[in-house]
């Protein structure tokens, strides 16, 4: 049997020492034993010189159900009464059928003291052991006889027959040498093969020849001899151990020594088998074994605590088993390891955590990427796969969560499944242990103190015109200490060497807290790879700009932009000096409330500063206003409007975080004015919060068709707001925007819609890389643009076919049917011939000049 060798028996089987004679009760099969073992007993043996302990080791005591005695029932164990001389040890013989020689497997037999009642071979003089008095040992041996019971183990004594029949034994307390108890020899315990007179071979043999052959085979010299068969226990049948505190009932006969091989008491192999063999799997996770980083959560308990954690998970997170077991998995969602139930997530994506919660409630499978934090605050991108399993019931009882760090092991993703999930190789043969740095490791106390106070800075600035003073030498230090941007220096390995005092205001960290740490401690785990790659790719003093997400100490992640260059030395690049500032991104959740009727193809969108300076304008400015977008960047939007005072008033309201809509006229490049309606939105905040920039939505209402000039001068009847009148709209009410009532009802039916941002790709806590998201958006835009172009081309072809098959046109004025070109008339359709159309256009133009206003024609 595998797993049992000479070293196992040599270390586990022990024989107590004794010099008195023990008379066992004789059984019905004693005459067989007496006929088969006719050898003499040694005359003398030292009771205190045994080489084996009289107490069994703890391992055997804990697993006694798998250790079996090798003697048969009724064999009298006659202990020697006198010690045997040492010079006679080499001439002793051993019986290969009844004695176990630990060194016989190596090709040699060890001189041992032979005992007719002892089934184990040992040498009393090889390795001296601490002596024990005879009286103490006799008392201990007598006590063991009264308290222990060793059931008999019948076997077939033919060595050619495999040892296939085993008996179920009771617990063995402190010794293997005990008299058999006949009360336990019941019918149910009787084996299928017992001692009898029938030979084990296929042909009959006389009993005398068989006994003589056994005696001849038993006598052997102490030199090298052929190895004999070892008496080995039967392999126990594999059964699942109980899972405390809710054990799983094992099928078949149970053992009182179950789960003695598992320190945790969990049948983890059974758990992984349930994961692999689960019915109707939704996610193909690939191969899993004990090298995976995973946890086991009990969803029947309150707050779904972790009840088992793998060793790889401890190495991945830096937390120990004592710190993990009993907690909910959400403790990894905070840098400090403390996240209360139901609180809003600041450092992770709240939408992803909501999906995880709903998945647990629905008892379904999920795979999602989420920012987690190791012990000490180190972030990492965790790809989580959660799978529910049943355990001895029809209801789901456990959730198995597998984790893998996508940044450190990007090759773990083997392939993409058709349903959007990924097949992950969770096996980690060499997962390094995350070492938590001590708090004082980085506190080298560099020169980060502020040199100049506010009064000293004022003195320096006032004395700049005085050439006799040397204050000009301190201007660089004054600039570094008082700028709003973070001036920082990075080493080639990405370690912070210096941070300006503005770090307290922008990132909420003290400069000394970050100096000595790497950029990965505060950078988004999905952005650290591209950032370091871009910085190291530059080998000259050319400026480099990087945009990434950085974690503030208390407020979560923000977008951050750094611009700088390398400082070169004699050996190349020494460090990089950068200037960083927060990068405010769009937060246009309220744009989702704009109805379909409020958007048009001719709308112009612009990004404005809080004072009205155009920072960006869409390409629709060229066909609508006749101006290139680059021409308008840097100019004031108020200069293009007819009412500058009303525009200033609207900007003042928009700076408070309110949404403002007003009507005005905007100047075309050719000089004429176009009626327009502008809505100012807060750019990077929700309504009610002061923004950093504004977003302007400029729409151009369509004038009513027809040649009535008086109607063209009036505002459109369906406009919600009057000309030059400012309307403030509260945060909770946007009744002036079409489609709001319908959206409000939808939000009431599904509250999750309110949490979805307009641009989900710009959420700072989003787990994916923003570069990848940008490339995907570009691909989607190209696909949509190509699809739109195909539809427009198909529409033109359809119109061309319809025009060829339509009835012949005739001029609405002269009724002619032949003309080189059809022109628009008073109806707005091309129903005038070339000459009539030119005359009508000239009349309209002359009438417009008389009225003193421009005309679209």
UniProtKB/Swiss-Prot annotation:
One of its GO terms (cellular component) is nucleus. Signal peptide: none annotated. Keywords: Activator, Chromophore, DNA-binding, Flavoprotein, FMN, Metal-binding, Photoreceptor protein, Receptor, Repeat, Sensory transduction, Transcription, Transcription regulation, Virulence, Zinc, Zinc-finger. Disruption phenotype: Reduces the number of conidia. Increases sensitivity of conidia against thermal and oxidative stresses. Decreases the expression of brlA and abaA involved in conidiation and increases the expression of aflA, aflJ, aflH, aflO and aflK, and subsequent production of AFB1, under blue light irradiation. Pfam families: GATA (PF00320), PAS_3 (PF08447), PAS_9 (PF13426). CDD domains: PAS, ZnF_GATA. A zinc finger (GATA-type) spans 811-836. GO terms for biological process: regulation of DNA-templated transcription. One of its GO terms (molecular function) is zinc ion binding. Induction: Highly expressed in conidia. SMART domains: PAS, ZnF_GATA. Residues 306-328, 479-542, 608-642 form the PAS domain. Transcription factor that acts as a blue light sensor. Plays crucial roles in fungal growth and asexual development. Involved in conidiophore formation, sclerotium production, and conidial stress tolerance. Promotes conidiation by inducing the expression of brlA and abaA. Positively regulates the fungal pathogenicity towards maize. In blue light conditions, inhibits aflatoxin B1 (AFB1) biosynthesis by down-regulating the expression of key genes such as aflA, aflJ, aflH, aflO and aflK. This is Blue light receptor lreA.
